[in-house]
Amino acid sequence: MLYFCLLLVLLLPNNGVSSEASCARMDVPVMQRIAQGLCTSSCTAQKCMTGICKKVDSHPTCFCGGCSNANDVSLDTLISQLPHN
């Protein structure tokens, strides 16, 4: 149930959730798969094929792959490109 609630929060459009939030617990063994799943789901919601948690300057960051630009791009970058209401 917790996973489902977190997933709903991350899939809401333009909710201000950073890529660090979806991958924040990637170093905790039990939470590793959940963090990866949240990253992938967030990227899929941004019309990318997949997502992966990586460390950038010791900060966990969600990178989306298989997007229209064919490059890996951080989730934060994709969210910042969304039209603002």
Curated annotation (Swiss-Prot):
- Annotated signal sequence is 1-19
* CC per GO annotation: extracellular region
* Subcellular location(s) per record: Secreted
Q: Does the keyword Secreted apply?
A: yes
Keyword Lipoprotein among record annotations: no
Descriptive protein name: Antibacterial factor-related peptide 1
The lineage's top-level taxon is Eukaryota
> Which keywords has UniProt assigned to this entry?
Secreted, Signal
Which InterPro entries did the record assign? Abf-1/2, Abf-1/2_sf
The gene from which this protein is expressed is abf-1
